[in-house]
Amino acid sequence: MLHTAIEAPHHLSYTGEIQTLNFGSQKSEAAIYRIEHRAPNLSRRWYLAPQSLYGDSVISRGETTYSIDVKRDRVVVAQDDAIDDQVAEDDNFAVLTSNYNATFAPDETFDGRNVRVVVLTNKFTGEMTMRLHIDAQTGLVLEKQIYAANGALAMQERFEDIHYTAAIPTGLFEVPKGMKLVNGPSRGLPSNDLQHVIAAAGFPAHGPKYLPEGFEPVEGDVVDIKGVRTLHLLYSDGIRTVSLFQNHGNADVGFENYKATTTRVENHDAKYVEDGSTMLLAWSESGLHFTLVGELALSELEKIAASVIP
């Protein structure tokens, strides 16, 4: 059932309305969008809420996304990250099943449809990490809930309505003409050979010597953050992810809109932010600036941080 759910968008075409809720310790966010998806890999999201996104849309064509910003009259073009493809391919599915137990909860109904409920529990911690509501007939995930390490609901994404149909015109997935095209964040060609990426970073980069049980390398690349050449290393256990960013400058990742708390990484000053299931931890040592971003508890990120430069 789980593998069927992962593969469902590759052969199902549909339209619908989706609501997403992200629950953070400092703020919560909600969004509503219409979606048109044409199998195997064309989709478009039309945002209805919040007001700041109303009228904007995102077109996905294979691995390329076009974010249409109507207020700025521009289209931001970017390549999908591996983070967006977690458990979407067979190798990631193998990682997931080696780290999580999938069990059935009592069936439910959605808009007259029978729904199978699958609960994913981490084999090492015993914690429930994800809960999926899957259309029993088509295999499509109709609702997804993600839980933080403390057991609190961190994210909920669900269809408010859905219609399966192949009558979706290809013109919906065409990028509007006349708008300015802008390249998204600059990133190098990603590689799953992380040691090679570290060696080619252009500065004395480091990788973690410790990872929580079940986490494996996914990919690494060099990105441009605030004009600073930054090495990005990504690890995953099939559901949760952790990213290590490092550079010669002081380009923080994602701290701008949050109030950070001070802490220590071994003998170095550090700061962290908790936002729902995601934790950010930043520190500097040996002339480098590091930021860890992961769906892990602070104690786990601190262990990873301490292992980067033992």
Task: Please annotate each region the language model reported.
Residues 90-147, 179-187, 191-232:
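Extended beta-strand-rich segments in extracellular/periplasmic secretory proteins, especially
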